[in-house]
Amino acid sequence: MRIVVMGVSGAGKSTVALALAARLGGVYLDADDLHDDAARAKMAAGVPLTDEDRAPWLGRVGLAFTTAGEAGPVVIACSALRRRYRDLIRAEATEPIFFAALELDEATLARRMAARTDHFMPVALLASQLDTLEPLEADEWGVTVSTRDSVTEVVARIVEALPAQGTIEST
């Protein structure tokens, strides 16, 4: 099983993805670790990435599913804000990917981002991310979940939406 936990900064991607990987007995990866230094510096300076900046990174995210091997479920925390970004990830992956889209109100997102001290993404880029965000479309394999509830409840909702073990969905 290959899963991307997606959403804007502050939605809880890393926290939920880590808990989901633990619940499934799988591997957790954070797509932020796959950004190159130039992209990190650009975002830290408050400059939104362009599609050209994102393309190689999204390819690395898709390839990460393959390089994680056969370790069981692989869960990656990744913004994957637009449909075309998700399509780029799918194109590089060797198996179908389930997307768990996290949503939360802007005020709570901003509060969470402001409270972080160890992240390169400034609150100033939240509006840009919200403008860029495209919800999952009807033909995309996944689920949308609010992160207003506890991490345990959010993970439970995602697990409920996953297919039974051994079934494969195509996207």
Report each predicted region and the residues it spans:
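ATP-dependent NMP and nucleoside kinases share a basic, alpha-helical "lid"
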Residues: 79-117
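Glycine-rich phosphate-binding loop used to anchor ATP phosphates in small-molecule kinases
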Residues: 52-95
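Walker A (P-loop) ATP-phosphate-binding motif of ABC ATPase nucleotide-binding domains
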Residues: 2
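Conserved lysine of the Walker
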Residues: 13
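P-loop (Walker A) phosphate-binding loop of NTP-binding proteins
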Residues: 8
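Small-molecule kinase domains that catalyze NTP-dependent phosphoryl transfer to phosphate-bearing small molecules
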Residues: 115-157
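Conserved substrate/cofactor phosphate-moiety recognition/catalytic segment
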Residues: 18-60
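Hydrophobic anchor at the beta1->P-loop junction of P-loop NTPases
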Residues: 5
